[in-house]
């Protein structure tokens, strides 16, 4: 699993990523201006900036991003752009549903076998979901069930229009994917700049 072990808050300010709800917006505005005023942005630097922003937000490697781009070119994907494909990964979906506080935590929970997709155990964070998929918690994840039942993760849920509400069924939680075409995008990634960066 790809992890960044450096100073994360400094990286978030540098790339202007509003990822964690508990970070103050005022703190971001005051500090991001310090970086933006010193940089003279060229077109290539803008492309590099967007690529680094994407990599850090979703904890992706260069190899995985290139794999998705080749996949798009091979199958002529017109319905999705690169951001849409990354957004329907299982780890990002778990984070958006509110089962975890960060994407890194979502990856760890998936690898440890806490989630079923269509009632099959999936331990691959990069698993791509599709419309109609059903996500359920495994019986051993009772503490996550208790937290979600008490709505302690409600403030972390960003895109209630994409995913249906979480159903409580006995001792498990069920989430159904209804739509994956209009992905909520909080950080406004520029898909064109990212694609041009990898076209060199």
Swiss-Prot record:
GO terms for cellular component: apicoplast; small ribosomal subunit. GO terms for molecular function: rRNA binding; structural constituent of ribosome. It holds the Pfam family Ribosomal_S4. Keywords: Apicoplast, Plastid, Ribonucleoprotein, Ribosomal protein, RNA-binding, rRNA-binding. Residues 88-148 form the S4 RNA-binding domain. It is found in: Plastid, Apicoplast. One of the primary rRNA binding proteins, it binds directly to 16S rRNA where it nucleates assembly of the body of the 30S subunit. Belongs to the universal ribosomal protein uS4 family. This is Small ribosomal subunit protein uS4c. It comes from Eimeria tenella. The gene is rps4.
């Amino acid at each position: 699993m790809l992890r960044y072990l450096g100073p994360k808050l400094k990286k978030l300010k540098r790339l202007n990523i509003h990822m964690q709800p508990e970070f103050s917006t005022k703190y971001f505005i005051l500090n991001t201006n310090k970086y933006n005023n010193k940089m003279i942005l060229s077109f290539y630097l803008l492309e590099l900036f967007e690529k680094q922003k994407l990599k850090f937000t979703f904890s992706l490697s260069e190899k995985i991003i290139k794999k998705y781009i080749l996949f798009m070119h091979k199958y002529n994907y017109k319905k999705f752009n690169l951001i849409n494909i990354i957004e329907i990964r299982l780890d990002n979906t778990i984070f958006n549903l509110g089962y975890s506080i960060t994407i890194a935590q979502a990856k760890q929970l998936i690898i440890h076998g806490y989630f079923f997709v269509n009632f099959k155990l999936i331990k691959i964070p990069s698993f791509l979901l599709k419309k109609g998929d059903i996500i359920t918690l495994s019986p051993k994840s009772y503490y996550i069930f208790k937290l979600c039942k008490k709505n302690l993760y409600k403030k972390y849920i960003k895109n209630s229009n994409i995913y249906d509400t979480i159903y409580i069924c006995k001792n498990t939680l069920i989430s159904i994917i209804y739509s994956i075409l209009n992905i909520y995008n909080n950080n406004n990634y520029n898909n064109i700049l990212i694609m041009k960066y990898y076209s060199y």
